[in-house]
Regions:
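Internal alpha-helical scaffold of NAD(P)-dependent oxidoreductase catalytic cores
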Residues: 102-112, 128-165, 178-215
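NAD(P)+-binding Rossmann beta1-loop-alpha1 motif at the extreme N-terminus of oxidoreductases
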Residues: 1-60, 189-190
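Rossmann-like NAD(P)(H) cofactor-binding subdomain of soluble oxidoreductases
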Residues: 37, 46-47, 55-60, 64-131, ...
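Small-residue helix-packing motif on alpha-helices
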Residues: 30, 40, 58, 194-202, ...
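NAD(P)-dependent Rossmann-like dehydrogenase/reductase catalytic/cofactor-binding core
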Residues: 203-270
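A short glycine-threonine-serine/GTX helix/turn-capping micro-motif
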Residues: 166-175, 196, 224
């Protein structure tokens, strides 16, 4: 199986690192194109992958082709490569706001499309991806792509109408988490904890808490209640967060990201 990437931005680099670290394909089975060779040089030096500046060459060689370019560049890239793409290839799109219908329309023919919203924790093998596909993708082909994304984290099949929600909660989600870690660490530093230790305490607390949710199967509210002793320190802090509107702020932020993704999709369809 030959896996190709057109574009080598942060998301693509995270995915490629995860794929090669987990040995999903060998470096010789992975080809990446990018207009700037500097972007691919690090991956080439580290893993020995095949790199080029020729998008058509990647399209020709790939069994599974990942389009990892900015949404505004999609039409130009698809126009460039569409004559090289066959009905046997699987096209994976990871751009926000680009629907499968829009991508297929740009190709101007029936193509197998899997739309995915991954996130950057793929770089450390802890990504979260939502996947859907069009009617030309077989169950076996979808499973193959699903396994690729599971190699660097968790992956869930969804319907395309839920992609906006996935963008809001997990595609953009790491940024919210980093802000929370930063805020917790700042508060700890204000209380005298050294900066480096403050980040470790904050980040590990979020990591451990997330694993508790995933591995125990308990409701997050139930786990929260278990930490809140009567008249204790935790319930005092929770009370402040509730007064300051933490829940509503997070809900509004996720909703705003989802709405923005929906708006981007509408613009692409015009």
């Amino acid at each position: 199986m030959k896996l190709g990437f057109i574009g080598c931005g942060n998301m693509a680099q995270a995915m490629i690192t995860g794929i090669l670290t987990q040995k999903v394909v060998s470096p010789q089975e992975l080809i990446v194109s990018n207009p700037r060779e500097k972007k691919t040089a690090k991956l080439k030096d580290e893993f020995g992958i095949i790199t080029t500046t020729d998008n058509k060459e990647v399209a020709k060689q790939s069994d599974i082709l990942v389009l990892s370019v900015k949404p505004q560049v999609y039409p130009a890239v698809i126009k460039e490569i569409r004559d090289e793409v066959s009905s046997e290839q699987i096209i994976v799109t990871i751009a926000a706001g680009v629907s499968m219908e829009a991508a297929e329309r740009q190709f101007g023919k029936e193509v197998k499309i899997v739309r995915v919203m991954p996130n950057t924790p793929a770089l450390v093998g802890e990504g979260m991806s939502g996947l859907c596909c069009n009617e030309y993708v077989t169950e076996e082909e979808f499973d193959l792509v699903h396994k690729i994304f599971e190699s660097f984290g968790k992956a869930e099949k969804i319907t395309e109408n839920l992609m906006d929600a996935v963008v809001g909660v997990s595609g953009s989600g790491p940024a919210y988490v980093y802000m929370f870690i930063e805020a917790m660490a700042d508060a700890a530093v204000a209380q005298g904890l050294p900066r480096k230790q403050a980040y470790t305490f904050a980040a590990q607390t979020l990591l451990g808490s997330a694993k508790m949710v995933l591995e125990t199967g308990q409701h997050p509210g139930e786990l929260k209640d278990a930490v809140c002793s009567p008249a204790g320190t935790t319930i005092e802090a929770v009370n402040v967060l509730e007064k300051k509107g933490m829940r509503s702020a997070v809900i509004e932020a996720v909703t705003a990201a989802a709405k923005k993704n929906h708006q981007l999709g509408k613009k692409k369809e015009k």
